[in-house]
């Protein structure tokens, strides 16, 4: 189940790389219906087309990837099978959208993150619950869980109705720098490198914005990966949630001055 990154040739920050805006999990399996209560689905309002995943972090806020942004977005909570008619109580709109503009020690590769305030709070239920922000940084070598409604085949596009889940490995960032020399990734970064070096398992197009969960903690946001997905020795990049905590928490707290991480 390859979480196929949004390889729709979206050029973010003037970088010519394939983003996982709508990636699926390749080499994975259908997620248990109770495994993804925090996973939300983002749709384009006008075309009604599925865009990305996102993560509910409390009853009023969703965290996703910046490149998933559109002028008009619909957000659905408590979704498993996208072919089933959504209930209007599952639908939300962005009340506010926040983008990461901090410049200190952050490169353009580190800013693919968007915080969305919903137009009204959601009610938790059997199929809706938040995923807490991380309390500690991720550990290289961890086995992480990725999930989404992204492509399950690549380069052919096969989009599933239900989310797929897969386990991938958290790798040293230098592995991604070596694997993708053409992009001249910075020597240090606030992004995570993750994948299965043997290939066959990956996130893919339309998985973008969804969570990477390591040791039970929300550590990454699906961001970028090679096209086709799931190639051997070609891991992907994930926005590192832990390094954006100050920014996230200051916005949610309603502080007038947003805190930029050191």
Swiss-Prot record:
It comes from Crotalus adamanteus (Eastern diamondback rattlesnake). The keyword Disulfide bond applies. Keywords: Blood coagulation cascade activating toxin, Disulfide bond, Glycoprotein, Hemostasis impairing toxin, Hydrolase, Hypotensive agent, Protease, Secreted, Serine protease, Signal, Toxin. Residues 1-18 form the signal peptide. Its main location: secreted. N-glycosylated: contains mannose, galactose, N-acetylglucosamine, and fucose. Its EC number is 3.4.21.74. Belongs to the peptidase S1 family. Snake venom subfamily. This is Thrombin-like enzyme crotalase.
């Amino acid at each position: 189940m390859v979480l196929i990154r949004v390889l729709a040739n979206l050029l973010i920050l003037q970088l010519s790389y394939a983003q996982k805006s709508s990636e699926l999990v390749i080499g994975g399996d259908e997620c248990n219906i109770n495994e993804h209560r925090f996973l939300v689905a983002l749709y384009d309002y006008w075309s009604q087309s599925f865009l990305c995943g996102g993560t509910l972090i409390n009853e009023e806020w969703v965290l996703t990837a910046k490149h998933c942004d559109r002028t008009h977005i619909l957000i659905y909570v408590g979704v498993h099978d996208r072919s089933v008619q959504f209930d209007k109580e599952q639908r939300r709109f962005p009340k506010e959208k926040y983008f990461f503009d901090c410049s200190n020690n952050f490169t353009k590769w580190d800013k693919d993150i968007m915080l969305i305030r919903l137009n009204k709070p959601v009610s938790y239920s059997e199929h809706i619950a938040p995923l807490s922000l991380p309390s500690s940084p991720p550990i290289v070598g961890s086995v992480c869980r990725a999930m989404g409604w992204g492509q399950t085949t690549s380069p052919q596009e096969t989009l599933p109705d239900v989310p797929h889940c897969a386990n991938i490995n958290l790798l040293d960032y230098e592995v991604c720098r070596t694997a993708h020399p053409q992009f001249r990734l910075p020597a240090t970064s606030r992004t995570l490198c993750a994948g299965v070096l043997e290939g066959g398992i990956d996130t893919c197009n339309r998985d973008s914005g969804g969570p990477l969960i390591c040791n039970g903690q929300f550590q990454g946001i699906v961001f970028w990966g090679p096209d086709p997905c799931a190639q051997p020795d070609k891991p992907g990049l994930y926005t590192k949630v832990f390094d954006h905590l100050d920014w996230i928490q200051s916005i949610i707290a309603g502080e007038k001055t947003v805190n930029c991480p050191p």
